[in-house]
Amino acid sequence: FVQFDFPDQNGKPYKSSGGKMVCNPELKREIPEGWGVEKLGDITICHDSKRVPLSSNDRELVKGKIPYYGATGIMDYVNDYIFDGDYVLMAEDGSVMTEKGTPILQRISGKNWVNNHAHVLEPVKNHSCKLLMMLLKDVSVMKIKTGSIQMKINQENMNKIVVPAIPLELLFEINQKLEVIDKQQLNLIEENKQLTQLRDWLLPMLMNGQVKV
């Protein structure tokens, strides 16, 4: 999809089959003819005001099975949640980008707690979380991040990120295909969480001899 080889009207890869591409000055790249651009702030709702950070001491008092997310991943598990739904997280400060200069993204679903080091984005206007991840994964954030030692992507700059605007009829088709992939990936993520929790519970008992193999 990000290489614009989605199925054309004949079911063939659009770009590879000679689909017309036009240069877009805002994106500084070619996009399919008929596509436009839109800002991230126009296709998402940012829920940053709902985030609540917990110190390590605070988290010790509320241990549970609900993931507690930071900028780059799950930091802990707690017994309560702030968010219950489907969201995309974008790292706000600390480690905010990959070695390629693209944003650090996480896809979360269900009950979760997110601290103040990751932006919480809910896609709107017929965009899905999976589609949003794909639109953002190759975007450079080099010019919008601030700071050199303690890097940060503030909400204002994040909302100005431009991404390709997909025609509505194609948007529905793409979302249908991505939904199947998204469900499979979420199932794998959930299985991995359960295995991680099992490991963290079992390993100390193996180390002190409570359990033998």
Regions found by a protein language model. Give the residues of each.
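Sequence-level motif detector for i,i+2 pairs with an aromatic at +2
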Residues: 1, 35-38, 63-66, 85, ...
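Extended, domain-scale alpha-helical bundle/helix-rich regions
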Residues: 2-4, 9
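Short, compositionally biased low-complexity segments
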Residues: 11-19, 105-108
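Non-catalytic DNA-recognition/assembly elements of restriction-modification systems
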Residues: 15-53, 58-70, 168-213
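Proline-centric
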Residues: 30-33, 118-126, 141-143, 153-184
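A generic local secondary-structure boundary/capping motif
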Residues: 57, 78-79
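Juxtamembrane/interface motifs at transmembrane-helix termini
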Residues: 59-60, 75, 98, 151-154, ...
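A short beta-sheet element
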Residues: 70-74, 80-159
